[in-house]
Amino acid sequence: MGNINDKSDDEIRQMMGGCDCFVFAAGVDERIEFPKPVYDAYHKFNIAPLERMLPLAKECGIKKTVILGSYFAYLAKERPDMNLTSQHPYIRSRIDQENLAFSYADENFDVSVLELPYIFGTQPGRKPVWVILIEQLKMMDKFPCTFYPKGGTAMLTVRQVAEAIVGAAEYEDYAKFGHKKAWPISCYNMKWDEFLRIVYDARGMGSKRKVVGVPIWMFAMFGKKIEKERELEGIESGIYTPGLAEIMDMNLFIDTKYCFKDLKVTQDDIHSAIFDSIKLSVDAFEGKAKLIGMKGE
């Protein structure tokens, strides 16, 4: 165990010796804000390590690599008309990460990227990503209803992510993809209002609270306010908030066949995974649990 970025090349070679597959499940995502330009931080933590690790993996005789990416990259490729890479530095970085990784693929080195959506479930000692959602929802508790985008999202559980990694590592037919493959990942597709019913139930408020879908322009207006606050603080987010409105309004669903058929992922209880994630997020928000959050360094 240790920080791979602190290891010398020789130490990494020793760690990789005798291994069949290299899995990159590190880096940072869009939740972490940095000083402008934020893209530089994403390159440092998500791309530069691969520029170093993948050549070492090939040198050590490793035959496969699995990289944990984002389903925003899937959306950017499916909907080039949305110009997501020009709006959102984080999405641009994920596309660049995929392209860099695929440049190392050959007949002796299969490269796969899991384009992961939202993940539910808990990890011992780790702060859930959903604490920020609790902060947002609590601001609306005083209202008779909750205002939220109309769309929905792909999702899966923590355990299913692990199974997808194993499935990608053991997949034997990468040759037909030119030894490189981006896997769109989803085990469940859920509308935001259905998701929020589970969230409110986990918060102890029942599952009957009314959720009102907001139009894109209203979400975008709220996003502009957030961007102005960030600018005053000298920070930049990887996702441009006004542009997020269109994404949140759409049903960002993915065919589950890639997980269940190709990668041999098994069914899980997504309702319980969401419930547990929110319960722990509430505890973290209220200071009842000491947890480690995501950080760059």
Task: Spell out what each predicted region is.
Residues 2-48, 52, 74:
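NAD(P)H-binding glycine-rich loop region in Rossmannoid oxidoreductase-like domains
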Residues 48-93, 112:
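Conserved Rossmann-fold NAD(P)-dependent oxidoreductase catalytic core, especially the SDR/UDP-sugar
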Residues 100-125:
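Conserved beta-loop-beta element that borders a ligand/cofactor-binding pocket
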Residues 121-134, 168-182, 205-209:
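Glycine/proline-rich active-site loop of Rossmann-fold NAD(P)-dependent oxidoreductases
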Residues 135-156, 176-179:
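A conserved pocket-lining segment of Rossmann-fold NAD(P)-dependent short-chain dehydrogenase/reductase
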Residues 153-159, 181-202, 216-221:
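Substrate-binding strand-loop-helix patch
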Residues 175, 196-250:
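Terminal hydrophobic/aromatic helix or amphipathic segment near a protein terminus
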Residues 250-297:
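Amphipathic terminal alpha-helices
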